[in-house]
Curated annotation (Swiss-Prot):
InterPro entries: Acylphosphatase, Acylphosphatase-like_dom, Acylphosphatase-like_dom_sf, Acylphosphatase_CS
Keywords: Hydrolase
Annotated protein name in UniProt: Acylphosphatase
Source superkingdom: Bacteria
Reaction catalyzed: an acyl phosphate + H2O = a carboxylate + phosphate + H(+)
Active site as annotated: R21, N39
Organism: Roseiflexus sp. (strain RS-1)
Annotated ranges, domain Acylphosphatase-like: 6-93
Pfam families, per database record: Acylphosphatase
Family, similarity comment: Belongs to the acylphosphatase family.
Transcription regulation in keyword set: no
EC numbers: 3.6.1.7
GO molecular function (one): acylphosphatase activity
């Protein structure tokens, strides 16, 4: 049985308007993580990553740098119980 994990992440800094969501979606699909990503009105990006623990950890680590034009200042990670409800990875508009 796979070791599953779920991370609820809030990323602060210059993370909107820098292709963060599309890059997160592409990397999530590459590493095989389900979930979603969206911009928040306060300028942060919020995301949920669920899947095999090692893949979720790769996504969380990626959030500390993000795409090349992002300037990440802080990452708030909340580890939650996996729900198994996520299917694929999407951008919430």
């Amino acid at each position: 049985m796979m070791d599953m994990a779920r991370a609820h992440v809030f990323i602060s800094g210059r993370v909107q308007g820098v292709n963060f969501r599309a890059s997160a979606r592409n990397y999530a699909r590459e590493v095989g993580v389900s979930g979603w990503v969206r911009n928040l009105e306060d300028g942060r990006v919020e995301a949920v990553f669920e899947g095999e623990r090692s893949a979720v950890q790769k996504m969380v680590s990626w959030c500390y740098s993000g795409p090349s034009h992002a300037r990440v200042e802080a990452v708030d990670v909340r580890w939650e119980k996996p729900t198994g409800e996520e299917r694929g990875f999407s951008i919430i508009w």
